[in-house]
Amino acid sequence: MSSSSPTGQIASAADIKQENGMESASEGQEAHREVAGGAAAGLSPPAPAPFPLEPGDAAAASRVSREEGAAAAGAADQVQLHSELLGRHQHAAAAQPPLAFSPDHVACVCEALQQGGNLDRLARFLWSLPQSDLLRGNESLLKARALVAFHQGIYPELYSILESHSFESANHPLLQQLWYKARYTEAERARGRPLGAVDKYRLRRKFPLPRTIWDGEETVYCFKEKSRNALKELYKQNRYPSPAEKRHLAKITGLSLTQVSNWFKNRRQRDRNPSETQSKSESDGNPSTEDESSKGHEDLSPHPLSGASDGVTNLSLSSHVEPVYMQQIGNAKISLSSSGVLLNGSLVPASTSPVFLNGNSFIQGHNGVILNGLNVGNTQTVSLNPPKMSSNIVGNGIAMTDILGSTSQDVKEFKVLQSSAVNSAATTSYSPSAPVSFPGLIPCTEVKREGIQTVASQDGGSVVTFTTPVQINQYGIVQIPNSGANGQFLNGSIGFSPLQLPPVSVAASQGNLSVTPSTSDGSTFTSEPATVQHGKLFLSPLTPSAVVYTVPNSGQTVGAVKQEGLERGLVFSQLMPVNHSAQVNASLSSENLSGSGLHPLTSSLVNVSAAHGFSLTPPTLLNPTELNPDLAESQPVSAPVASKCTVSSVSNTNYATLQNCSLIPGQDLLSGPMTQAALGEIVPTAEEQVSHASTAVHQDFVREQRLVLQSVPNIKENFLQNSENKATNNLMMLDSKSKYVLDGMVEAGCEDLGTDKKELAKLQTVQLDEDMQDL
């Protein structure tokens, strides 16, 4: 029997404890290496755990194991090993690693790594830090963790960090930038494309900043006052600056080119919608003004002519009486009820009142009105030169094609005229009512009207009544009633009542042909109204040098009206009843013409007998120095001709009236040889012999106005002889632009304005012997 001694047992127990301690220590070291290696390896993966297991946890586990071993050993020898076990326990407790740096040191290292841009080292430093209550809530550490999370693309952790802690305002700009950039990056990944400014704005509205990194105050960006003033000045001058101007403005204001462009875009948009931005705008404090897009939508109602000094043409047309508001040519503002106007090449369809304004446009409808030129009545199709225009009729000594290029001075002398006529067939009276009130233009009472003298027709012929033209300042107003059988007179022009001239070789019409020219001799205007009723007018375009027309023979009684006018007024002489075998008496009484003090135009009135068909002979030209009453009929002058035409009239008694004939371009002259008996010379009666003096041309009339005179040879021996070879020479007015030819006789006028009183020519009775024969 052997028994171990107590000392041996104690020694063996001590050896066991020592061995257990060594094993536990080695296990603790291995565990520490494993944890440390795992922590070091955890830095390399792209998405490591944000807070790995700290090394102190392994030390605590080893400490627990050592305590258990020490407790077991102490049970064996509580007395002898008490001090040793206590020392070992203290040694194990001292083995836990303490915090190597203070919180300030950790924050300084984080800031240094952030500023240096070493985000990978910052991430490794953060993983190496132990969990400590001292580091909990450190703002520098949280900011560093947020920056590392953004760098590694762990956006949910970033949002969690930013929303869980209230940061100081000094850190708000950086953290706000991280917030928005993270949102933008997520959206770009989801959409697969870069975001635009609008997309980013919508994301900012969808994901507002948390209050932890935002104080809740919105900052409105505003340019400096100097920059805003420079932008405003350029905006006043030009709302659409060029790129060069934008670059220059950006250089002056210190802004970028994009900022300048956006400012102009926003300002124009605010000005387009002034009702939406009544408050002050972001970039300037001035209320919005009207933009250019709202221009052009102004009121189309008539405006006062006195207030419209920018050369704007105002027209207002009605369906019954057509008052025309006129001003100098410019932009056209038209107010139409049931009318149409063609201005500056733009056609406005019309049903009742087409207007030819200042020779710039032509409109056709129920009433054709050509201001300062020609008036065409109802149901017409005027086309005497189809290849060029739909209306080429000579009026007021100027072809319509010439009027198209006339200046505004030709339009200044508009007159106010009212005309009324009685249709003998239907016995219906057409007369214009009182002048329509012109809003803002002129009251009705300011238009003076002289008395109207109406001469009734004995055999049912038409009676044309003219009132006195009234001049209102430099603007004219024309009133034209919608009458189907009246000849209308506008400023010494001719008017055609129902006349149909379609653009074909032959045109026929069953209606009234009223050609009413104005003539002057001495110091007054004279005019002979004449009509052809229920007749036909045939226009047969020949070669460019001749036009033949035929007027059927019909006996009518023509009455006339005499009027005393204002400045440039009209005095209408009388015409006696005439037929093919009757006598024509057309005279100008001196008492009707003297003392009027009117400025004359250069023309005269002569009645010429006409046949059913006759040709037109080529005209001859007389220079202004040769224009005197003593010129013979057969005196031709070959010279280049001017670009003006004459106004002619044909009556129902087969005679033509010509006046205001100006020179015609030589290449445009049309000639037709007198192959058959066409016209005979006129012999005035010996009752009165009046010396014809040269007349004066008014300065407002065409300066280059001259007369084209044509002599008519003695074709038939039974015609009366012309006495004294006065200025009553046969006249042919012809223009290839107008294709409208009329024969007649006119008295020449000179251009000298210094001539004083002129004697008036009196036309004597014409004896018509027999009818003319057709060509």
Curated annotation (Swiss-Prot):
Residues 1-76, 263-313 are annotated as: Disordered. This is Homeobox protein SIX4. Its main location: nucleus. InterPro entries: HD (IPR001356), Homeobox_CS (IPR017970), Homeodomain-like_sf (IPR009057), SIX1_SD (IPR031701). Transcriptional regulator which can act as both a transcriptional repressor and activator by binding a DNA sequence on these target genes and is involved in processes like cell differentiation, cell migration and cell survival. Transactivates gene expression by binding a 5'-[CAT]A[CT][CT][CTG]GA[GAT]-3' motif present in the Trex site and from a 5'-TCA[AG][AG]TTNC-3' motif present in the MEF3 site of the muscle-specific genes enhancer. Acts cooperatively with EYA proteins to transactivate their target genes through interaction and nuclear translocation of EYA protein. Interacts with EYA3; acts cooperatively with EYA3 to transactivate target genes through interaction and nuclear translocation of EYA3 protein. Disruption phenotype: Mice are viable and fertile; no gross morphological or histological abnormalities, or defects in hearing ability are detected in homozygous mice. Double homozygous SIX1 and SIX4 knockout mice die soon after birth and show developmental defects in various organs. Double homozygous SIX1 and SIX4 knockout mice causes severe defects in the trigeminal ganglia. Double homozygous SIX1 and SIX4 knockout mice exhibit more severe kidney phenotypes than the SIX1 knockout mice. Residues 1-10 have a biased composition (Polar residues). The keyword Kinase does not apply. Residues 54-63 have a biased composition (Low complexity). Mainly expressed in the skeletal muscle (isoform 1 and isoform 2 but not isoform 3), and weakly in the heart. Also found in the retina and the distal tube of kidney. Expressed in skeletal muscle, nasal epithelium, cochlea, parathyroid and salivary gland. Expressed in muscle satellite cells of normal and regenerating muscles. One of its GO terms (molecular function) is sequence-specific DNA binding. It is found in: Nucleus; Cytoplasm. Pfam families: Homeodomain, SIX1_SD. GO terms for biological process: embryonic cranial skeleton morphogenesis; embryonic skeletal system morphogenesis; fungiform papilla morphogenesis; generation of neurons; inner ear morphogenesis; male gonad development; male sex determination; male sex differentiation. Residues 271-283, 292-301 have a biased composition (Basic and acidic residues). Residues 582-775 are annotated as: Transactivation domain. Keywords: Acetylation, Cytoplasm, Developmental protein, DNA-binding, Homeobox, Nucleus, Phosphoprotein, Transcription, Transcription regulation. Belongs to the SIX/Sine oculis homeobox family. The modification N-acetylserine is found at S2. One of its GO terms (cellular component) is nucleus. It comes from the Eukaryota.
